[in-house]
Amino acid sequence: MVNTPEYRTLIGPGELAECIDQVVIFDVRFSLADTQAGRQLYQAGHLPKAHFLDLDGDLSGPVGPGTGRHPLPDPVELGTKLAAAGVNSEAQVVAYDDSHGAFAARLWWLLRWLGHDRVAVLNGGCAGWQAAGLPLATALPQPEPGQFQPQLRHDLVVSSEALADLLEQSGTTLIDARGAQRFRGEEEPIDPVAGHIPGAINLPFAANLDDSGKFLPAEQLRQRHEHRQAIHMCGSGVTACHNILASCHAGNELPSLYVGSWSEWITDDRRPVATGE
């Protein structure tokens, strides 16, 4: 895998097809409405050699009092799962989904958090792979296990307490990846409280994409992600990773993530909530 070109943000279907025997691929398709749908889709057909990881069961930890809907997984447990699929310190990892990168970006960010930089999201996802005339498979991969030792990047994670302190300081930029109507508090289909954290800027993650569902070119993303030192959030620490990925693809340094995001913020009714713009 040492000779494989490094992909640290995005990889196209053709590029992946050329190096598919030298990479470790993860299918992270998922549906918030039907949590078994992703696994069922994987069983019906997936990219050759792809392993399945579940957002709730593998890419998140247990939900508890005061947490958001998708807390961080135990890094040792996740590292063990990655190693079982063949990931080692030099592996090129690729993640894909069928949600325009919304869930694949979570795995991308988790690997960066674990200290592994050679990870990319398949631009266009499963649909883009098929549109390029590339095949799906049903056979389960039989990898040679790797040796993977997490090297945690604690600087990439912001807690609720730290965020509250930072927001009292001038110069802190908080970016919320949720859709505009949820941000403004006009609707809230998932969480029990509507609105946003006062002072946050709304940059819906879907605007990182073109009409075909692929990421915009880096120069266009650079105009959108001008806040290079921002803290990113969303509803539960998932789609915020999409904005972080887009920011990195634009050439910015890896920003930090408020993992608990909105669903954790509202577990304490002493924390302020805003509505409107």
Range-by-range predicted roles:
Residues 1-277:
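Cytosolic catalytic domains that perform sulfur/thiol-centered chemistry
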